[in-house]
């Protein structure tokens, strides 16, 4: 070839290479040209199951790739990265047939914590309007999710790297999938697992500890839509598992119906977004916890205080997961929800022939929290657990009020004002092994219905 013919072609080739980086890494998949989102459904859309798998990765954290699970190598041609852990999000029953408002916040919260594959299982078509039909679809859905996970494993993912996060009915779908894998998946998190049709179901039909190497569940609506029985290695009962603070009154009917139930989801999102720990305390019941009978991270079933979130096994050593454990914690009305817990105690100098009720309030830099404790008849000690939004050392003041006794007052008889004398002590949880509490330096005299204010100066 003559030099004058070669030069223009070489120049053209160089320009082409500059403008078109020929297959810039053959295995690299760019941001999808089309972003897929949830299907929409309605009460008139029927109950036929139609499942979409939406993939989000560090390469496309805001843009869902629709994976056709029936197409050979569809996952392999996507942005899926088998070297990363995989979070599989499964929603539950839908009344309206629209995308859950919590879906995007949960996806983004996961990406802020770690590089991960996020797969959203959209079964809006098949979960809308008719709850019983949605329940009937669970086994079929579980089989499809199982087949999808097997494709991930074929690409090199490990069973232990799979974490299913299921909300309401989605928690039991996760249980069905985990059962198909013989409990070898890494983790299943149930966000207020659904109650109806599952409370009396067999372990194979619902979420249970045998479904994964670690199963945790968050209970927030156990007196309504959420299941009350423990279903995991660790079960968190938030504010006793029902009646969440900040949820609206029955006047706002729809929000009233779903607020407690969805609080588990928003608590989980908050645990990923905020550093303050949502720590649970092992105890036999919420009543025993609030009464101040479970002050440390030790019980017959558990020797740790697990935390909601992505911490491995909730921070619990593997050897402690041989039996199911229930843990309890209180929260605030809004994100980040986390509170500090302290035990408060009043010790009477002299026992009384009637029960004694004392309101104890903490005043911090901004907010105020209070509880009422009871000293039983002929007893001398009353205690309880009080939640507060700042550490105990930042609580400036304690206010104690002796509550009035109920009595019938005769018109011809004078009424004597009641008074007691005793000692006030407190300690932030978990309590120290020494059992030593901080006590005010002097005894207090409380007069009925008269608030007594005292500075509270504990060390940070």
Q: What feature does the model see in each segment?
A:
Residues 125-127, 195:
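Alpha/beta-hydrolase active-site loop signature
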Residues 186, 192-246:
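The feature captures the conserved acid-bearing segment of alpha/beta-hydrolase catalytic domains
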Residues 2-120, 127-137, 147-155, 159, ...:
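Flexible, membrane-associating and regulatory peripheral segments of lipid-active enzymes
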Residues 91, 164-177:
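Glycine-rich nucleophile elbow surrounding the catalytic serine of serine-hydrolase chemistry
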Residues 156-168, 188:
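Alpha/beta-hydrolase fold nucleophile elbow
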Residues 179-186:
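Conserved hydrolase catalytic core segment
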Residues 144-149, 215:
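Short, well-ordered amphipathic alpha-helical segments that serve as non-catalytic structural scaffolds
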